[in-house]
Amino acid sequence: MATLKQRGVPNFFGRQRFGFRGDTDLVGGALLRERDMEAVSLICGRAGDLDTGRRREARVAFDAGDLGASLAAWPRSDFGPQQLLRSLVRQGAGLTEASAKVAIESLDRRDLGFYLSAFQSRLFDQVLARRIEHFDEIWPGDLALRLPGARKAFLVEDLAAEQARAAAGEITASGPLFGPKMPAPEGRAAAMEQAVLAANGWGQYDLQGARFQHSPGARLPLRIPLMDLDIRDMTGGDVGIVELSFQLPKGCFATSVLAEIQKP
């Protein structure tokens, strides 16, 4: 805990960002490439070991091509798959690229944005994972953010001065939410981000698709401060209990802190 307090916490989105099947980022990537059949199949079908009950029944029916049975099986709370299937059934053409495109266009904008941002979040986490040994450092050409919650990044030019501010917890390097309006760093940071794009089959010029208008890109902090930390021993009897409380900047996940604490 002392190390996290001193260095800050790696600002991973973590598993909860990608759904219980861990594939919302794959949906987002398919949507951004306008591979709508693939996106619809990921949302409505491709039954796997994690699927149970009515959701498994619905996905199995979809995979078998029975769109009506799939629609009937989805729980009412699963609005996205139901909306897609209603559109496909109404069109009456089965699953084709054309019918999938119409179905995707029927999705609620919030659902669409959720999938697109999941794709961006996955790549952000991959950049942070590559930089994890140096996540609290500043590199020449970095786009840095003031802590705890600034959104406007600035280019690191005076490395000595900015590294001192980073060591004091005043600023942090930023990472990418890739998109056409995302400011790009220079030097070593830029090369790392381009390598992550390439590893996922993307190039910088692929980030101009029409659907990026829903998630145009931004910079986020690679680390976040652990504020107002309080640890209390609440052990009673033979049961060891520790109460942990802390504050994080808006938009950051407490699960990221817990994941770091539980590392061996």
Task: Label each region the model flagged.
Residues 252-256:
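Pseudouridine synthase
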Residues 1-237, 241-245, 249, 259-264:
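Extended, charged/glycine-rich binding lobes that contact polyanionic ligands
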